[in-house]
Amino acid sequence: MSRVANSPVTLPSGVDLTLNGQTVVVKGGKGSLEFNIHTSVQVSKEENVITFAARDGAKQSRALAGTTRALVNNMVVGVSQGFEKRLFLQGVGYRAALKGNVLNLSLGFSHPVDYELPEGVTAECASQTEIVIRGIDKQAVGQVAAEVRGFRPPEPYKGKGVRYSDEVIRRKEAKKK
């Protein structure tokens, strides 16, 4: 069984954490994030160290304590360093362009795909076939990357589609007569 909740979260310099009842607010150089903690999780702050514990010994409470610790740690990393996901477009004529807050994608369809970026997430087109998605909320960055990838997931025969930078596509051999 994992013991994630037992390890404390250390706040780096420039990051401030505020506890208001069951609400945690993390402020840093890149912005601020807010999170509501479940009632079965107890959070305590001593100087720049935050500890998490289950209020009772129930299995669900211990699991929630570990999940809460991981989420708060992601908030601390997000407001201090930020998160980014890189996507590559692979295929003939596949390209991406950013117009304001709208990501314009040509993915081999008969129509262009326009994706409006949500608040708190920014994108940058390093080249016509590379998209870098950045933000302070790890979940939002991952969700945007997954939605963009979902427009044209990589296919196993030629490898065409939108893929993550660290994703390896298992290739298949075409059927032969």
From Swiss-Prot:
Record protein name field: Large ribosomal subunit protein uL6
UniProt keywords, alphabetically: Ribonucleoprotein, Ribosomal protein, RNA-binding, rRNA-binding
Complexes and interactors: Part of the 50S ribosomal subunit.
Domain of life: Bacteria
Molecular function via GO: rRNA binding; structural constituent of ribosome
UniProt keyword Flavoprotein, yes or no: no
Any one of the GO CC terms: cytosolic large ribosomal subunit
Protein family per UniProt: Belongs to the universal ribosomal protein uL6 family.
Organism: Marinomonas sp. (strain MWYL1)
Function: This protein binds to the 23S rRNA, and is important in its secondary structure. It is located near the subunit interface in the base of the L7/L12 stalk, and near the tRNA binding site of the peptidyltransferase center.
GO biological process: cytoplasmic translation
